[in-house]
């Protein structure tokens, strides 16, 4: 057996062992337990080991493609698929570690499935209307009954309950599907996420095959511990973006209308994928009728899909509060904000405008200035999505899915090593809770967070300088 295959197998075994440890540790983080008693060090160590095992796959997978002496056994991809699937199923029964966004998903799904508008009332309004003697309009009263009878007080445990939902309509449809399968059951939400992620994996495999790349490179997505853990333990919904975005990538060169439909669907799940459009469709920039037709189609479809959110915008809208005020675990944003604060009165808002301008400019540069070479499209999407994560006011680990979905297409690209390192540093995010409880949150902000993002960024910049002629 070739040494590369042996190393690949060893890495997979270590990854599986680390995940088993993670699973066994999660009951200690159950709701009601004391944060000071949580085994945070052991948990973070297991996450780092899982990240290192996954990272070790990168040079091995490169050799699968680049070395003609290595014959990749046909069993490699099926083994990767089975292992990734088993790790996901393992976490179906785990206790969520420091995350409760899923409560909003469960509630939104119930509201949507019952024919109500999730952007109309906040959970707090519904909770107050459920109290005895409260008077309310009929539609609010109906949701109050739902809260009391079915949700068992869930509305009182949701993050930012005074705000209406932040999640766009297509995401609401997914939440509603989980409700129809099993109302207010977390396993139903995970099952629906798994179904859509399998569609995303199919799009990834089709894209790799279309580009003549090894299917085994899909392991960088399918076995990534951050993707697996934040989706099936933390139950975050960003994995829903993978299928439509990678489908748009698959069809962008041959069937631009289908690609436009897929990108519009992604924007109806989360709005940011619109940033990818100039890169995805740059091959058509010399054909104005097609190019502007694609742009118009995306604009119309996205506007229509987001119309329920747009019509409900006010001070209690989650999307308004998030875009204006939210800052959490951010790396570069605070520096931009503080620098602007030396010159203007509202640096928080100004920093968001500056970062939006930087990202838009980067997207347009990649879309209009760089060569149209279709082989570089995935690596440019990787860089663009990573720039968004580095600059975002919120730097949550589940946002890493935004660029990790493109990594299997860019195994040989200079950016792969630096961006892959973020998977290891993500463990710092989970350390912050116990550190905060112990009064050491400043250590997380001033030491761990800069290390989490700074080391990968330094490696990324170094590798980029060495390959500056190959953007």
Map each language-model feature to its residues.
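Short alpha-helix
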Residues: 332
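Multi-pass membrane glycosyltransferase architecture that uses lipid-linked
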Residues: 1-327, 337, 345, 349-471
